């Protein structure tokens, strides 16, 4: 925050007195709807540092963005552009420092040999290795099969305009949002094993080339704020696609799927579509938006594994373009989670993506996950566990092209 404060001070120092008056006046009359004005008494006849202090006190981490918007309001476009660039550099450096201060994680390596060579043999013979069920002692592969340039060229040639084509660069670019609730206000609702899901999901997203924004233990209100803030990230403008992964307890209220926050308030999943639709997130127009939900959806079951449900409690009304939502279970059904190893849904996704993302599009990957879970004998009868695709509006083939 100190770096941002210094940047704001430097910008205001460059303003002449008349420009500073325009700037402070804009702050007290209001920069834009939804941004609370700063009281006039805190700004009038104050020096530049006082103005900066008032902005930081009022807007906290948003002070930099609001300064950029205010500069544009008073036609200081070059200064706004320069400040925006400097803010991104500070933010990037902050994320890098945070990562460096954390315990280093093994860097995933991309290999060419089949994924089946590096994981344990399946518990039974079900035919194709691609269709084997996840065994109880499954461990996440540390590798992902890359897509060769030849395979990519073949797919592009075969399907042409029917593919979401990566924009540029050596790797598909995009942001991913990862929210995992583990510890709840009511400790009886704690989701043991969910930390493994978080670790596995983050590893997969980073291996696929996505920058991951991660949150843990959020209330329903905080989930709403996190998704809304994510939808406003400027990085989406240069992105090819995005992933949103939310893992918590879940329920259904008035035929609507809801995520349960750590304070037992809820976040309705349909809000994610609203925040990321063409109106509220124009930067993601015509780009795939993949939503993965590990949570219960109401219902009852006699299964013996941990269940991602808290409340004892159809379909959405409107559609948006280029969305697909893959949920861990059918409506009115529990989702299961191993208290040590994490959820079967996330484990299957990681396993299938590692072995098949180099050649299959996203819908085929989801089909393989569903088929493998359907064949898993642990989830037959009353303890049924079958994921489903909801509210899809994907209009083209979405290939992840790992490694390219």
From Swiss-Prot:
Catalytic activity reported: Strict requirement for Asp at the P1 position. It has a preferred cleavage sequence of Tyr-Val-Ala-Asp-|- but also cleaves at Asp-Glu-Val-Asp-|-
Phenotype seen when the gene is deleted: Impaired pyroptosis in response to bacterial infection with E.piscicida. Morpholino knockdown results in no observed phenotype. Morpholino knockdown results in impaired gut bacterial clearance following bacterial infection with E.piscicida. Morpholino knockdown results in pericardial edema, erosion of the tail fin and body axis, and impaired up-regulation of il1b, tnfa, il6, il8, il10 and ifng1 cytokines in response to bacterial lipopolysaccharides (LPS).
Keywords, sorted A to Z: Apoptosis, Cytoplasm, Hydrolase, Immunity, Inflammasome, Inflammatory response, Innate immunity, Necrosis, Protease, Thiol protease, Zymogen
PTM statement from Swiss-Prot or TrEMBL: The two subunits are derived from the precursor sequence by an autocatalytic mechanism.
Pfam family name, one: Peptidase_C14
Residue intervals of the Pyrin domain: 8-80
GO function terms (MF aspect): aspartic-type peptidase activity; cysteine-type endopeptidase activity; endopeptidase activity; lipopolysaccharide binding
Gene Ontology biological-process entries: defense response to bacterium; innate immune response; pattern recognition receptor signaling pathway; positive regulation of apoptotic process; positive regulation of inflammatory response; positive regulation of interleukin-1 beta production; positive regulation of neuron apoptotic process; positive regulation of protein processing
Activity regulation note: Activated by homooligomerization induced by direct binding to cytosolic LPS.
Keyword presence, Cell membrane: no
Enzyme class, first EC level, given as a word: hydrolase
UniProt free text on domains: The Pyrin domain mediates LPS recognition and homooligomerization.
Function per UniProt: Thiol protease which cleaves IL-1 beta (il1b), releasing the mature cytokine which is involved in a variety of inflammatory processes, and mediates apoptosis. Component of the NLRP1 inflammasome, which plays a crucial role in innate immunity and inflammation. In response to pathogens and other damage-associated signals, recruited to the NLRP1 inflammasome in its precursor form following the recruitment of caspase caspa. Its subsequent activation causes the cleavage of the midformed pro-il1b and results in il1b maturation and secretion in the extracellular milieu.
Official protein name in the record: Caspase b
Source species taxonomy: Eukaryota, Metazoa, Chordata, Craniata, Vertebrata
